[in-house]
Amino acid sequence: MKRRTLLALAASTMLLAACGQSTTNEAETNATDSAATGGSDLLQRINNGGTINVGTEGTYPPFTYHDESGKLTGYDVEVTRAVADKLGVDVEFKETQWDAMLAGLDSKRFDMVANQVSLTTPERLAKYDKAMPYSWSGAVVLASTDDNRYSSWEGLKGLRTAQSLSSNYGELAERYGAEIVPVDGMAQAIQLVKQDRADFTMNDNLAVLDYLKKFPDAALEIKLTAPASEQTGSGLVLIKGDDAVVAKLNEAMAALAADGTLTKLSEEFFGADISQQK
């Protein structure tokens, strides 16, 4: 009885080992086939002129929004379309809320995100890759056009700045010795500067350029721009590990920078070139 049991166990063990070896061989074969045909599914679609799926908000002008005709457009959207043209692929945008953007990448609802994502935290850097940046942002000082007191950041000491008390820009202005005039947001800050109740306001260059493009007669201009080392770049973001795809995106983006496409799109949506560090 015991011998039969041992023989049965031995037979079962041999069968399981054979099945396991078969499964391993199949997995190795599939992996080899995948590598031979071009790597990841996304890479194969790019190589074969397929479709890439891109997550974006569609409610965040001037980066991603719907124009008066209902067409999805914006700087990030048009840059992505230009990248797709360079790659020879179609692009399908999948609109989603900002809070669900990276979760959509995780669940493979889309291949990449085009929505002013800069990836600055260690947690995100460990999980996602970012292609070559197509926009750069950093702090700028906005003041009256005829105010010529802004030769350096250190020169802000003693000047009045309209800032939200809880903003990073308020903290930065305080570090340079400026006096904070509290406001609720950028719109109110600009009004105080125009009314001479504050000397300047500080904000992100992209937000300021968007305002100046909409209101060219505001009699305001950017006086100081954060150095390149303090600027952050936003680019197409995808799950970490697809190095070949990132390389192709970088190649396409570099070509768009070289042929002037990024500069042209920047000026169309912002009135200035935001595609390069300055």
Regions found by a protein language model. Name each.
Residues 20-22, 77-86, 167, 231-272:
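Extended ligand-binding regions for polar small-molecule ligands
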Residues 77, 93-103, 148, 166-167, ...:
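Short helix-initiation/N-cap motifs at beta->coil->alpha
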Residues 81, 90-155:
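Acidic, polar ligand-binding/catalytic clefts
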Residues 135-140, 205, 209-250, 272-278:
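Periplasmic-binding protein-like
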Residues 19-29:
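Bacterial lipoprotein signal-peptidase II cleavage site
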Residues 50-56, 153-166:
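Short loop->beta-strand "edge-of-pocket" segments that line small-molecule binding or catalytic clefts
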Residues 29-116:
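Extracytoplasmic small-molecule ligand-binding "clamshell" domains
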